[in-house]
Structures are given as C-alpha cells and as structure tokens.
C-alpha cells in the first residue's frame, strides 16, 4: 500500500493519497469570501520543504483568477507579519512563527492578519481562538489502511480535503 502525494503511475497498487493540487485550489475557492477581508495571500514555502511543488502553481492560479495579490515566501526565518495579509502555513512550526511574530508586531490573528494551516491538529482549535485549516480526515486514512492490511481489501483512493473554519480568517 502506498500512502503518498499521488503524482505517479500507480494503477497496479493500492493507495490512499492526499491531493495537494486541485483539492487545494477548491478549498481556497470555498474560503474565497473569508479571504476577501485581506488583499494579499502569502504561501509560506521554504526551499527545502517536503511538500509538492505543484501547490505553488495552484496557489498562484487561485490568486490570479480571484484578484488577490500573492507572494510565495521562501525565507520563513526572517518573516515579518503584516496587516492585511493571509499567511498559508504548511508546517506547524510556521503556524507558531506567524502567531508569535504577529503578537510582536502588535497584530491580532483573524482581525489584522489571517492564518490558514495545512493538516489540522488538535491545538489549532485553541491557538488564538482557533486556526483555520485544510486537512484530510486522518482517522479515515488510518481506517482505510487498516482495512487493507487486515482484510487485504484493495483500495485506490484520494481522500477529500476538508476546510475547518475557525477565527483566524
């Protein structure tokens, strides 16, 4: 069984994948009205990030088609959080960095700047009144994988990306 990004030929294999391209784009579309409170979107995508590079293309496409200013920030260490910007963080450490840096700048998450995180975790429910996230259902992934292992039931599935809307947007 393959648990992966899914961008390769895999007809003969069982797999459970997360779509980081079109599903990412569609999730941004679902959040479009919330995102409109901020004129600029910044994707935090450090140079050595183990994440599909194609997400950058879908992010840029969304911004161009929907009329947002967009930026892909590779230097996360020297990040300055600015008013009127939504930060999209892929790594948990980047979520913490944005929240802490925003506080140092005297800015409030969800009012002065927005924050959208990849891969929901329980602490996102309580950090700064809640961090909006894009995530698959990890329990579903585990159940599907267990069913494959225990019952040898073949599977070829992309898990849906869910939006968990909280006060950070």
Give, region by region, the residue ranges found by the protein language model:
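Structural motif
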Residues: 5, 44-49, 88-93, 119
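Hydrophobic alpha-helical segments within soluble ligand-binding/sensing domains
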Residues: 6-42, 95, 134-154
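Short, charged/polar "capping" segments at the starts of alpha-helices
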Residues: 9-10, 49-55, 94, 123
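An alpha-beta-alpha
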Residues: 22-66, 157-169
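Flexible, charged surface loops at secondary-structure boundaries
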Residues: 34-37, 78-84
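Short helix-capping segments at alpha-helix termini
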Residues: 63-69, 104-109
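A short, well-structured beta->alpha microelement
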Residues: 65-80
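Flexible loop/turn connectors
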Residues: 81-86, 93-169
